[in-house]
């Protein structure tokens, strides 16, 4: 089947595939904040909850995602499922001519990420990966202040959360991995977004604090192509507290921020200068709006398929490092 034209007119007609914890955030913003989207229908595995949500949002409940994708009135879909399902759903969506907003991680491994990329190319539709931290107000403000730091020396990123209530996250057959894949991809993408450089080598360690099948705690050291910058990345889903720490150090000073607690400081010598920030930005709203704007204006997505593929490539290199106990190269396709 040939993909539909990439030029769209507002309101765009959307379907939601997966309306659980993450998918519900998309549904809420579409219903309350995005008049440029007309929600046609949704599907989730829990039929009772799916029907209730369809009534709540004034749309149709589809009994299978294939039925939703077969609806010719739908222009685009948001896919927010356990990532082991992404390949089959994206292949069918592309075949049906639907543009795709895909929740991260794009895939559970490089093989499946490349397969999705090939599918999108074959059918002429468009896909954007939901790397929402690029739209965080703290991240945007920090990125704008990096050039005055001069040559960069090091970066440190840390994301920590409480144990997840989602049972499927600790089922490897559905999740494909633990915090390296599901949260690490945010940090891996931010390294590239903040520096404009590609990660070259990684050395990674993992363990399990609460989980049984997957890791919920990791630390990694990363180096970059054509640069002496050293980065450390950490993540945990086993503590009773949250953070989203970002530290960037350059020749002329440092930036220290937290995208969870909404603060940013410039550091020169012993002086910490707080940077005034607005209220926290709802990143799901911002990225959905950007997805719609890009479709309607026929301009590139701010997060590309390649961005999604590369985040998975870095995660895969981390997993190889945990197995070999050595530095591993990031394999770029």
How would you name each of these model-derived features?
Residues 118-126, 140-153, 225, 250:
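Basic phosphate/pyrophosphate-binding loop/patch that engages nucleotide-derived ligands
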Residues 26, 57-119:
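Beta-loop-alpha module in the N-terminal Rossmann-like domain of NAD(P)-dependent dehydrogenases
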Residues 1-11, 76-79, 122, 293-333:
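C-terminal helix-rich "cap/oligomerization" subdomain common to oxidoreductases
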Residues 133-211, 325:
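Predominantly a Rossmann-like dinucleotide-binding segment in NAD(P)-dependent oxidoreductases
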Residues 2-57:
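N-terminal Rossmann-like dinucleotide-binding module
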Residues 182, 189-262, 285-299:
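Contiguous beta-strand/loop segments that form the cofactor/metal-binding neighborhood of enzyme cores
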């Amino acid at each position: 089947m040939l993909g539909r034209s990439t030029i769209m007119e507002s309101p765009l007609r959307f379907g939601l595939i997966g309306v659980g914890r993450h998918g519900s955030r998309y549904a809420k913003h579409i219903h309350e904040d995005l008049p440029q989207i007309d929600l046609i229908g949704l599907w989730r595995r829990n039929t009772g909850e799916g029907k209730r949500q369809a009534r709540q949002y004034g749309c149709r409940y589809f009994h299978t995602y294939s039925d939703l994708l077969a609806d010719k009135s739908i222009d685009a879909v948001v896919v927010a499922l356990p990532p082991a399902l992404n390949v089959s759903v994206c292949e069918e969506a592309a075949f049906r001519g639907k543009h795709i907003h895909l929740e991260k991680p794009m895939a559970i491994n490089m093989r499946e990420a490349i397969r999705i990329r090939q599918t999108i190319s074959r059918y002429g539709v468009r896909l954007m990966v939901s790397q929402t931290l690029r739209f965080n107000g703290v991240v945007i403000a920090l990125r704008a202040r990096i050039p005055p730091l001069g040559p960069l020396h090091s970066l440190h990123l840390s994301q920590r959360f409480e144990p997840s209530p989602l049972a499927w996250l600790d089922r490897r057959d559905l999740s494909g991995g633990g915090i390296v894949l599901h949260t690490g991809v945010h940090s891996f993408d931010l390294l590239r977004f903040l520096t404009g450089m590609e990660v070259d080598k990684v050395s990674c360690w993992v363990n399990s604090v609460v989980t049984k099948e997957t890791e919920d705690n990791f630390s990694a050291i990363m180096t970059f192509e054509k640069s002496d910058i050293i980065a450390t990345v950490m993540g945990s889903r086993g503590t009773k507290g949250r953070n989203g720490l970002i530290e960037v150090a350059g020749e002329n000073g440092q930036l220290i921020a937290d995208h969870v607690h909404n603060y940013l400081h410039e550091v020169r010598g012993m002086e910490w200068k707080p940077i005034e920030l607005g209220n926290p930005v709802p990143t799901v709203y911002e990225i959905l709006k950007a997805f719609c704007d890009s479709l309607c204006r026929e301009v590139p997505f701010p997060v590309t398929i390649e961005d999604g593929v590369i985040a998975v490539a870095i995660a895969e290199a981390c997993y190889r490092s945990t197995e070999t106990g050595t530095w591993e190269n990031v394999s770029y396709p």
